[in-house]
Amino acid sequence: DILAAFRVTPQPGVPPEEAGAAVAXESSTGTWTTVWTDGLTSLDRYKGRCYHIEPVPGEADQYICYVAYPLDLFEEGSVTNMFTSIVGNVFGFKALRALRLEDLRXPTAYIKTFQGPPHGIQVERDKLNKYGRPLLGCTIKPKLGLSAKNYGRAVFECLRGGLDFTKDDENVNSQPFMRWRDRFLFCAEALYKSQAETGEIKGHYLNATAGTCEEMIKRAVFARELGAPIVMHDYLTGGFTANTSLAHYCRDNGLLLHIHRAMHAVIDRQKNHGIHFRVLAKALRMSGGDHIHSGTVVGKLEGERDITLGFVDLLRDDFIEKDRSRGIYFTQDWVSLPGVLPVASGGIHVWHMPALTEIFGDDSVLQFGGGTLGHPWGNAPGAVANRVALEACVQARNEGRDLASEGNEIIREASKWSPELAAACEVWKEIKFEFQAMDTLDPSSDK
């Protein structure tokens, strides 16, 4: 069975058992009345069952309802169909004040019907020939308004300075100021030039997201013809069907696939309604993507440490044990489906490097947009500062130093022999984003 954990807030006067049963029925075989055609099938075989209900500690009138769905209710290899059933009409149900899908366990038999990420972590490292450290990226800013040639120039400067990747912003598709074909050509030129100068393999996430699936694949084909190693997709705005199609194309044609999660906060930010990001992350691993943005814990965007690490491990590891202290409601076996690299991006700079290296470990991509392009000396020195900071943190960690307590000292030491890093340290020493996360763990959910 596919198991789901829902956070249910019933309307006043509706008992939790009734609310849980209503969720199970409406998201499987039920409708609002008894119909004659019920007698033509075996409802016992196909109906969802609410098998356990527990109150949420510290929250009045909130319950976690566990529902089991028979596997035959779902089309093989279709995240779209899975979500249409589990989070379809039921979210508009009048008997509920609010409803949130907290976690999902897909059985191994169902996981095996998905291709998953086009390549996965190990194959990506082999393609790029980069081992033993996180990968470094940069989102080109300003995100909108640059001409293709100026955009390509910024890409070259960042890659030349020592970054592994640069990135199209999620809103960059094919606008009047920069059509996609021109951008792809100038970025490919920047790639080849920076590779020749540094001797390292470089990549730029060429955003293939488009208004139709056909146009999206056309852009991916052009990227492949240019010899680009990686393309990009906005998987929530583009949709799971489009994403799975692109992931299949990428595997067949040797392209890596970077996934941006634009629109996720609309779905996952409220604690009592929507879908938790850990479910969207699992769905992405099934649908296909080699990288996905996962929050930073320390930057400008939402994300509590334990919750973030919970779904970061869900993306990378082959087997995850149930651990309510990190918000993981079910044990999940990925049966060798390739892993996805989490991408930390959003409001981070060189002073965050020790924390990011410690939190995310080697199998991650650390992306500094403003933290590269905001360097007072320019784009290339900004890239140099980030690369030096990363190498210093990795070396310190390998020597057994504690990045959590000695992080600032490690960065200060490194800045003595890197003027670029020293300048970056001076600019960003005061910037902090200290707000309480909206989506937090429940008080005693460490069962």
Swiss-Prot record:
Query: Which cofactor is recorded for it?
Result: Mg(2+)
What SUPFAM superfamilies does this protein's entry cite? RuBisCo, C-terminal domain, RuBisCO, large subunit, small (N-terminal) domain
Q: Where in the cell is it found?
A: Plastid, Chloroplast
| Main location (coarse class) | plastid
Example GO BP: reductive pentose-phosphate cycle
The record ties this protein, via Gene3D superfamilies, to: Ribulose bisphosphate carboxylase, large subunit, C-terminal domain (3.20.20.110), RuBisCO large subunit, N-terminal domain (3.30.70.150)
More about this protein: The basic functional RuBisCO is composed of a large chain homodimer in a 'head-to-tail' conformation. In form I RuBisCO this homodimer is arranged in a barrel-like tetramer with the small subunits forming a tetrameric 'cap' on each end of the 'barrel'.
This protein's assembly is summarised as: Heterohexadecamer of 8 large chains and 8 small chains; disulfide-linked. The disulfide link is formed within the large subunit homodimers.
What this protein is called in its record is Ribulose bisphosphate carboxylase large chain
Give the organism the record lists: Ligustrum vulgare (Common privet)
